C-alpha cells in the first residue's frame, strides 16, 4: 500500500519559479560547519520543484524526490514520505523537464557513466538535474545518523555513518550535476541520492553499476539561493580553506 505524504502538488499557476531554475536552500559550506538546523519548511517544496535532494534538520535522514513525491531516507535503512513540519538545513529543488534521454542497456560503472554523460552535455558550465531509472547491478549508499547538540562538523559526523549495499536492485537515482565554480555553494560534480523501487530504502549515493537503465537530463540555466535566517548560519565559519577537501570527505566514496 502506498504511504501518503502531506506534501501537496501545486498547479502551474501556484509555482514560484521557472522550470529552468534550481532553488537551493543554504550552502554546502554551512553544512560542513555544523549548521544542521534550518528554517526551510519542506511543506513549501511544491512551490519550487517536483524533484530534488537534500537533508533534514539534525541530519536526520537524506531527502529524495521526483514526480512530486518526496521521501526521508533514515540511517536505520527505512524510507518514509516527507511530512508537514519537516525542515531542512540544506536542499535543492527544480521542476524536472527532460531535455535529453539516454538508454544504458549494458553493465556500466559510475566512472564510465560519468564520462559518457559528460561527453553528451552542451557545456560543463551549466547545471543539470539527473535522473536514472531501472535495474542497477549495485548501488552503495550512506545515510548520516541523527546528530544532537553540540553539533560536530560534518567531517566528524560522517565517521559513524552506516553504509548500505544494494545488489541487482530496481530503483531511481536522482540529483544534480554542478559546475566546478559552484563548489562550496553546492557540491560540484555529481551529487546523487537513491531509493529502491518499493520506496523502502536508499541513501546518498557513493557508487553504482548500471545494468539496464534510462537516463533523463534536465538542463538548468539559473540558481535561486535562499540563505537561512538563523543565528547558527549568521555565526557559521564559511571561509574554511579546506572546504573542497572536506566536501570530498563527506560526499565522496568511503576509503
UniProtKB/Swiss-Prot annotation:
This is Alpha-acetolactate decarboxylase. Pfam families: AAL_decarboxy (PF03306). Converts acetolactate into acetoin, which can be excreted by the cells. This may be a mechanism for controlling the internal pH of cells in the stationary stage. Induction: Strongly induced under anaerobic conditions. Activated by ResDE, Fnr and ArfM. Transmembrane segments: none annotated. The keyword Lyase applies. Its EC number is 4.1.1.5. It is an enzyme of class 4 (lyase). GO terms for biological process: acetoin biosynthetic process. It catalyses: (2S)-2-acetolactate + H(+) = (R)-acetoin + CO2. The lineage of its organism: Bacteria, Bacillati, Bacillota, Bacilli, Bacillales. Keywords: Acetoin biosynthesis, Decarboxylase, Lyase. Pathway: Polyol metabolism; (R,R)-butane-2,3-diol biosynthesis; (R,R)-butane-2,3-diol from pyruvate: step 2/3. It comes from Bacillus subtilis (strain 168). Belongs to the alpha-acetolactate decarboxylase family.
Amino acid at each position: 500500500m502506498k504511504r501518503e505524504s502531506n506534501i501537496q502538488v501545486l498547479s502551474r499557476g501556484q509555482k514560484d519559479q521557472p522550470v529552468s531554475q534550481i532553488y537551493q536552500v543554504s550552502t554546502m559550506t554551512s553544512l560542513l560547519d555544523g549548521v544542521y538546523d534550518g528554517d526551510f519548511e519542506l511543506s513549501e517544496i511544491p512551490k519550487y520543484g517536483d524533484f530534488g535532494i537534500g537533508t533534514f534538520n539534525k541530519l536526520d535522514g537524506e531527502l529524495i524526490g521526483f514526480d512530486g513525491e518526496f521521501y526521508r531516507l533514515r540511517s536505520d535503512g527505512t524510507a518514509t514520505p516527507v511530512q508537514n513540519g519537516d525542515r531542512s538545513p540544506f536542499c535543492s529543488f527544480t521542476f524536472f523537464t527532460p531535455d535529453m534521454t539516454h538508454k544504458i542497456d549494458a553493465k556500466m560503472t559510475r566512472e564510465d557513466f560519468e564520462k559518457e554523460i559528460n561527453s553528451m552535455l552542451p557545456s560543463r558550465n551549466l547545471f543539470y538535474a539527473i535522473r536514472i531509472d531501472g535495474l542497477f547491478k549495485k548501488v552503495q549508499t550512506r545515510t548520516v545518523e541523527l546528530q544532537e547538540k553540540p553539533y560536530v562538523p560534518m567531517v566528524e559526523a560522517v565517521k559513524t555513518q552506516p553504509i548500505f549495499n544494494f545488489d541487482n536492485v530496481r530503483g531511481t537515482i536522482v540529483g544534480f550535476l554542478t559546475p566546478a565554480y559552484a563548489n562550496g555553494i553546492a557540491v560540484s560534480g555529481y551529487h546523487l541520492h537513491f531509493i529502491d523501487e518499493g520506496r523502502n530504502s536508499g541513501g546518498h549515493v557513493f557508487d553504482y553499476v548500471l545494468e539496464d537503465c534510462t537516463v533523463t537530463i534536465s538542463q538548468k540555466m539559473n540558481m535561486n539561493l535562499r540563505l537561512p535566517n538563523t543565528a547558527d548560519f549568521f555565526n557559521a565559519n564559511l571561509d574554511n580553506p579546506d572546504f573542497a577537501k572536506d566536501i570530498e570527505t563527506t560526499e565522496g566514496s568511503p576509503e
